[in-house]
Amino acid sequence: MATIAAPPVDRNASERKFYSRMAIFLIAVVFIGFAPSFYLRDIVPSYPRPNPTLPPAVLFHGLMFTLWMALLIIQTQLVSTRRVETHMRLGKAAMFLAIALIPVMYVTAVWGVARESHPPFTDGLNWTAIPLAVIPAFSFLIYEAWRRRREAQWHKRLMLGATILFVAGPGFSRIPLAPPTFWGFTIQLLVGTTLMFAPLFFWDRKTQGKIHPATRTGYLVAIATAVVPLALIYTGSWAGIAAKLPGVGA
């Protein structure tokens, strides 16, 4: 009797599924974090934190950030369906969006002083350390991802790490899971950052037997992006510098 050979197993199928699910997971966290203040504003109750009005600049920032998250899911789906050429072409547009996000992040951060959108445990000037710290970290990870765009294992992890910078801080830390104190926020931010990277840690261990250097790089950058501004807020040493930044309080 002739034996019918089983079709070869697609070794990349599990990887494509993993990154698709990671994208969906991150988008879900962002939606939950920003639903009361942006996506479902005036529809669902707001979280117990400052919820000022949304001027055009903040709305624009939110739309660009949403577009970035949408591109993440589109890109993972393109890879999942093996449309790699389309993925690479769209990747060029994503890089332009990443560059455009940088000045928008800056403006939104410094204008937040006048909006008084900071939490109760600090003041508006010191609080700018949190969103401003994301800018060099995001820029570095995006640059490295672009430089290593031909190295798939590096590229996809660095892009994911850059996106987690948005999700762990601005997104996850908005969810009222800890007391609205400095240490409550600190614990939630650091734990949230680690939780965002945890699936990638497990995936690396499962598929490579060790943590991939790109994953380690992204995680260390993300932790530094949290620890450094938190230290500046704790000591109150950032306010004097922030007060001299262009656009503060505009």
Identify what each model region corresponds to:
Residues 230-250:
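Juxtamembrane boundary at the C-terminal end of a transmembrane helix
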Residues 26-43, 229-234:
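Alpha-helical transmembrane segments of multi-pass membrane proteins
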Residues 204-225:
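Interfacial loop-to-transmembrane junctions
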Residues 78-109:
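Hydrophobic/aromatic-rich structural module bridging two neighboring secondary-structure elements via a short loop
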Residues 49-63, 120-132, 248-250:
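Short aromatic-rich membrane-water interface segments that cap or initiate transmembrane helices
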Residues 10-25:
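N-terminal membrane topogenic signal
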